[in-house]
Amino acid sequence: VSCEDCPDHCSTQKARAKCDNDKCVCEPK
């Protein structure tokens, strides 16, 4: 998942979007 799509991707998991080296990382809220 790209950084652009990260917020939507993570919100479905009720997680916080974070970017690491241009990769999407979801952190539990």
Curated annotation (Swiss-Prot):
It is found in: Secreted. One of its GO terms (molecular function) is potassium channel regulator activity. Its main location: secreted. GO terms for cellular component: extracellular region. SUPFAM superfamilies: Scorpion toxin-like. Expressed by the venom gland. It comes from the Eukaryota. Keywords: Disulfide bond, Ion channel impairing toxin, Potassium channel impairing toxin, Secreted, Toxin. Pfam families: Toxin_6. Disulfide bonds join 3-19, 6-24, 10-26. Inhibits voltage-gated potassium channels. Has the structural arrangement of an alpha-helix connected to a beta-sheet by disulfide bonds (CSalpha/beta). Belongs to the short scorpion toxin superfamily. Potassium channel inhibitor family. Alpha-KTx 08 subfamily. This is Potassium channel toxin alpha-KTx 8.4.
